[in-house]
């Protein structure tokens, strides 16, 4: 049987995650932002490509054939027909491909240091007692990360399709090797990649959801769960919940694209949050690493931190000012289309100011959690994330940055880890890694997992 086919038991109570409100079927028309449908459906064999991958770089952005934003609704059928009430076994997996992982982990094999490193390296471990904050005295708990360790690693190259990437499978193999040297056991690591020969180990939408069920099953305080996704990401228009409220300050939900997204749809951030965060008990750690476009808030964690270690808030005036600057530059160069676009962007920012503030507060009210969830993502919600080649190996820029920092000096704080990853990427890429959390955190505490 495949991961996730079982009920969760926390404190003697059984919980069965309901997925009915998330129905993202195939699109009925062309997707937003000019992405047309691909020339054909994904191949059925999911075998290796007939030749070496091309040498140019792509971003981990919306694949062609993505779904129309105004056609997604939080309603409808259950996601999958299986009953989650049986046992659970991790899928059998073939031996690793020798051709894809010969260089080893980034940051090892004598690679040079990446330059200036932030932080003194003297960091306190997170407190083990219950924490509280806010006027309602909301409680949460850091994880000691000394319980069971489990990991789910998802890498999708979209082999043989128009959306093909080169780095995700390598990223998964590299992260797996990293985790094996940090207390994780191979029997507690599940990999889903599209070069697998085992059907249940292929990263389809249902397999990913089932594997997430396995990851969170029987989670307990001080367990350490690790989720890594490398592949395409995108956005879709935020839809109101049953009370008519929105939780995205920019008006868009973030999504990830399974291998079969064209037929079975994407996976939206609300669903990821409900499965990976809401189900966890206080003191259980979920460390999520997203190497995909538009991934800044893809786990819907309401507390986002800057490289100064302070909470970020929506900056509508800054966005409006950027639109006015674009309009002025377009006027100077005689670009009438650019003038209109810049002014429209500025007006839209002002109009969205009220909704943005309300959505941000509503997100904190509904998405704050007592567990210890942390998300490290490759870029802001409005940015793309690079699929690149570093040291002769195809890799995602974010996966590379995380592994390089942690391999060269695993004694990091939340803040120094974020700063050092940005340092690695800023010389070649415009993307800015993001740090979000399920509760307020002290960014100067030691990053453990």
UniProtKB/Swiss-Prot annotation:
GO cellular component, one term: cytoplasm
Listed Gene3D superfamilies: 3.40.50.12660
Polar residues bias spans: 56-66, 119-132
Record region (Disordered): 1-132
EC number per UniProt: 3.4.22.-
Coiled coil feature spans: none
Annotated InterPro entries: Caspase-like_dom_sf, Metacaspase, Pept_C14_caspase
Compositional bias (Pro residues): 27-55
Keyword field contains Cytoplasm: no
GO MF entry, a single one: cysteine-type endopeptidase activity
Gene Ontology terms describing biological process: apoptotic process; proteolysis
Residues annotated as the enzyme's active site: 232, 293
Keywords, sorted A to Z: Apoptosis, Hydrolase, Protease, Thiol protease, Zymogen
Biased composition annotated in UniProt, kind: Low complexity: 10-26, 67-91, 98-112
UniProt similarity note: Belongs to the peptidase C14B family.
Function: Involved in cell death (apoptosis).
Name by which UniProt lists this protein: Metacaspase-1
